[in-house]
Amino acid sequence: MEKQLPISVWPEWKIIEKIGEGSFGKVYKAQRIVQGKTFYSAIKVITIPSSQGELSSVRSENPDEQSVKEYFHSLVEDCIQEVSTMEYFRGNSHVVSVEDYKVVEYLDDIGWDIYIRMEYLTGFLDYCMGKELTEKEVIRLGIDLCKALEYCQKH
């Protein structure tokens, strides 16, 4: 499945497949080719509000459009704060690195798309697929996980 990002986001990156989806957005595997070399990134797309139903629900509870926009904009700001925190961890070998992000506001309605480009890593289930982990590998993974948690807690 080839999907294009809006041209203004990262024109050099092409989405090649969806690799995940959750309540906070969709994650795609993207590639760019530079001088014959292929590079991969994961691009998370978070849409605020997440659906037309969510927008309608908030509109029904708020007296005016400005209040609705302020509510959803505060969610965008929270998301940007989380991305900024993740950027702080860049370079730590135990935490996924954020490479770039962009926020695109809708012109025709209340809403934003937040694009977060991160290093592309093999998912744990894919890593384990079709092989049995040795005791040594399990211990190494456990230690790496503990180091990541320790680093996050300290910072």
Predicted feature locations:
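AlphaC helix of the protein kinase catalytic domain
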Residues: F124-T134
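Short beta-strand micro-motifs within the conserved protein kinase catalytic domain, predominantly
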Residues: S97-W112
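Conserved N-lobe ATP-binding subsite of Hanks-type protein kinase domains
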Residues: K26
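Conserved short submotifs of the Hanks-type protein kinase catalytic core
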Residues: D109-F124
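Protein kinase catalytic-loop region centered on the HRD/HxD motif
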Residues: K147-H155
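Activation segment signature within eukaryotic-like protein kinase domains
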Residues: L141-G142
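ATP-binding glycine-rich loop module of kinase domains
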Residues: V34-C79
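Structural motif at the C-terminus of the N-lobe alphaC helix and the adjacent alphaC-beta4 loop
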Residues: S84-S93
